[in-house]
């Protein structure tokens, strides 16, 4: 497969660095010089600057101060560092909020916010767009030829919603365009005759509100789409200015940490306007989940971000080299975990390891957030040594830059599907757990070290051998037909209970569930039984089934009551009034097969099911050797090279028998012994010949 090349043509090294906020220390000029010394010690070669610097750059309206930034840009270049320069729109100045209150967001209760925190701005506001355009243009013109500049970082962690009059009118315009200015089309799409909610004109429509209209699911869904649309439109506004002046400088925006998968912005919509994907990675290590479980959750998001640009390496723009200050418990990373967590990103496709932030703030809300340089101000800390070790390892990985992977497996996680599931009134109000369900299916492949993409339902299915679509409640137009074509041409589809229920407007399909998936799955889903937490049913695997599975498994939370309409029954329910009904089926369709899992299950079932499926389909693993529990392997490659990352997500030393494989350690340059040892929370990176 091809090599994508480096993120910037200016630098052919793995990027290692941090968000750098020198303006916090502008009254202590000796700090800047000390920062440079420490950056060299830690093998730092890139810093992200200016993310929250609007007030420092424009202390009064129309009065600009770039001298300090000039000095920083020159200082970084002189000392061999590159700069990712941010636009400062993530946090606006106080003067703007007071002079132009329309730039402040309005909450869902229709009360305008006071000035405070960050992200407290309206993306629709013409004033806000005007003011950011001025400063973006000045930044681009001033630094377009600066040798340190390698990337634009637009704003910071886009999130949030605004319900001001400007946004409500923009929402109405969005709806007018979507429904061809025909209010009758909207009424049909939203099923407004229920409860007498029919609209006579677009002017009557208000955004969802707890004290207004929260019950029209079509309205709620279109509002979430609008939020993404308006956020993206704002991003494009900033991007257009930078691209006009610096067309050859790549542009990104940093996506939020994995909690963003439950939030209101569909990152797939940004794909056409990103030169590189970047995201902020903040795992919950050493918590209630085991570290290998947490590792699989983070792997899920890494693989999603890699898939957004079709396999192109991404950037881990932020991470903590230690603890955070906003997670419920700020548990320190155990020895080795920082290196493991950092290199896991590289294993899944990142060409950078970056931190928030370089030096701990002395005050304000993130003064206790982990950073490379602690309040002590020197290099003699455990965290600094860990960061330095990461930098040393990255300096040996130049050949890994631009490599990727071509997975045979894809798991569908779709934001619009999540919004629709979360909004549905039933079959359980709580614990629908769409993300958790998708992640559990993903984990079964991660546990086998089978490379996997995480995609949405609009992606191309044809390049995969297996597409897994858990809880595909919403099926947008054309998706059912494309899945049929995928299976017909030899692909394997796995879907589950509560799939094929509604269309893109959250209107239920008529003619039987799973709607557009009914034909390809060869089943009819008649009812869905929602169980209480303490309830349990059991599923018994049929003797002599085509997957060769055996045994009995628990069924909890959801049990779909399905009928075979041509599909092979692989397992049946063991108890309750639906005893004997199918619980797992396989339908031969064209050259491929479609599996339907009718019940929510535990890791044991998914592990056994996907292990059997992987064996049947001879799915490629990162490396074809037995790996001990707790070890995950990922692979990156191009036409010339293949690199395998062995990662130990356990607190115990592990030994791997590499058989007769010819492996060279990328860090030491030595040939790997037949018995390869990996220390607790350790990583080994090898080149395979």
UniProtKB/Swiss-Prot annotation:
Family from the record: Belongs to the glycosyl hydrolase 42 family.
Residues that bind Zn(2+): 122, 162, 164, 167
Gene Ontology biological process terms in this record: galactose metabolic process
Recorded GO MF terms: beta-galactosidase activity; metal ion binding
Active-site residues, Swiss-Prot/TrEMBL: 157 (proton donor), 318 (nucleophile)
Superkingdom of the organism of origin: Bacteria
Name of protein: Beta-galactosidase Pbg
Protein's UniProt keywords contain Zinc: yes
Gene3D superfamilies membership: 3.40.50.880, Glycosidases (3.20.20.80), Golgi alpha-mannosidase II (2.60.40.1180)
Gene Ontology cellular-component annotations: beta-galactosidase complex
Residues binding substrate, per UniProt: 118, 156, 326, 366-369
Gene name of the encoded protein: pbg
N-terminal signal peptide: none
Keywords of this entry: Glycosidase, Hydrolase, Metal-binding, Zinc
EC number, as in UniProt: 3.2.1.23
SUPFAM superfamilies: (Trans)glycosidases (SSF51445), Class I glutamine amidotransferase-like (SSF52317)
Keyword Hydrolase: yes
Catalytic activity: Hydrolysis of terminal non-reducing beta-D-galactose residues in beta-D-galactosides
């Amino acid at each position: 497969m091809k090599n994508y090349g480096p993120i910037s043509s200016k630098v052919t090294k793995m990027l290692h660095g941090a968000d750098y906020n020198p303006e916090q220390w502008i009254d202590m000029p000796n700090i800047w010089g000390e920062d440079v010394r420490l950056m060299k010690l830690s093998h730092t070669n890139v810093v992200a600057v200016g993310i929250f610097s609007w007030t420092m750059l424009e202390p009064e309206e129309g009065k600009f101060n770039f001298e300090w930034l000039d000095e920083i840009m020159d200082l970084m270049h002189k000392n061999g560092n590159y700069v990712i320069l941010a636009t400062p729109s993530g946090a606006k100045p106080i003067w703007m909020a007071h002079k132009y209150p329309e730039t402040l967001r309005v909450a869902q209760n229709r009360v305008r916010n006071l000035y405070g925190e960050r992200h407290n701005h309206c993306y629709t506001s013409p004033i806000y767009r005007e003011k950011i355009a001025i400063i973006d243009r000045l930044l681009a013109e001033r630094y377009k030829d600066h040798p340190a500049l390698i990337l634009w970082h637009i704003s910071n962690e886009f999130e949030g919603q605004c319900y001001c009059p400007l946004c409500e009118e923009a929402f109405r315009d969005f709806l007018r365009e979507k429904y061809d200015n025909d209010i009758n089309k909207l009424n049909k799409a939203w099923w407004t005759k229920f409860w007498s909610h029919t609209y006579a004109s677009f002017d009557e429509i208000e955004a969802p509100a707890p004290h207004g209209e929260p019950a029209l699911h079509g309205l709620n869904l279109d509002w979430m789409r609008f939020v993404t649309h308006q956020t993206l439109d704002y991003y494009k506004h900033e991007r257009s200015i930078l691209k006009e002046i610096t067309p050859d400088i790549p542009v990104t925006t940093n996506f939020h940490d994995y909690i963003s998968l439950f939030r209101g912005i569909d990152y797939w919509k940004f794909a056409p306007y990103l030169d590189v994907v970047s995201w902020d990675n903040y795992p919950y290590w050493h918590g209630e989940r085991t570290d290998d479980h947490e590792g699989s959750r983070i792997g899920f998001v890494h693989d999603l971000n890699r898939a957004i640009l079709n396999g192109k390496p991404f950037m881990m723009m932020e991470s903590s080299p230690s603890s955070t200050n906003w997670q419920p418990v700020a548990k320190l990373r155990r020895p080795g975990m920082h290196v493991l967590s950092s290199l896991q990103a590289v294993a899944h496709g990142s060409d950078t390891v970056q931190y928030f932030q370089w030096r701990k703030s002395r005050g304000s809300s993130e003064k206790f957030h982990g950073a490379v340089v602690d309040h002590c101000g020197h290099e003699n800390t455990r965290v600094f040594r860990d960061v330095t070790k990461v930098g040393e390892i990255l300096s040996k990985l130049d050949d890994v830059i631009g490599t990727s992977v071509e997975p045979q497996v894809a798991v569908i996680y779709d934001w619009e599907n999540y919004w629709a599931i979360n909004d549905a009134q039933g079959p359980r109000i709580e614990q629908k757990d769409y993300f958790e369900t998708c992640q559990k299916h993903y984990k079964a492949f991660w546990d086998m070290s089978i490379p996997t993409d995480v995609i949405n339902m609009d992606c191309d299915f044809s390049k995969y051998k297996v597409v897994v679509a858990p809880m595909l409640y919403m099926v947008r137009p054309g998706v059912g037909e494309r899945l049929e074509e995928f299976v017909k041409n030899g692909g394997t589809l796995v879907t589950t209970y509560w799939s094929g229920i509604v269309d893109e407007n959250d209107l239920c399909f008529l003619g039987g569930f799973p709607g557009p998936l009914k034909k390809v799955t060869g089943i009819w889903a008649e009812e869905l039984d929602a169980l209480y937490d303490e309830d349990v049913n059991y599923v018994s695997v049929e003797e002599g089934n085509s997957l060769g599975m055996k045994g009995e498994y628990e069924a909890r939370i959801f049990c779909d009551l399905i009928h075979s309409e041509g599909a092979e029954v692989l397992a049946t329910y063991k108890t309750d009034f639906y005893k004997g009904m199918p619980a797992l089926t396989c339908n031969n369709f064209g050259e491929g097969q479609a599996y339907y899992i009718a019940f929510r299950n535990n890791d044991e079932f998914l592990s056994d099911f996907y292990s059997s499926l992987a064996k049947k389909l001879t799915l490629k693993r990162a490396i074809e050797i037995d790996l001990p529990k707790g070890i995950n392997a990922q692979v990156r490659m191009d036409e010339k090279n293949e690199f395998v990352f062995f990662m130990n997500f356990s607190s115990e030393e592990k030994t791997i028998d590499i058989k007769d494989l010819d492996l060279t350690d990328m860090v030491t340059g030595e040939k790997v012994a037949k018995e390869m040892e990996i220390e607790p929370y350790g990583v080994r990176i090898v080149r395979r010949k």
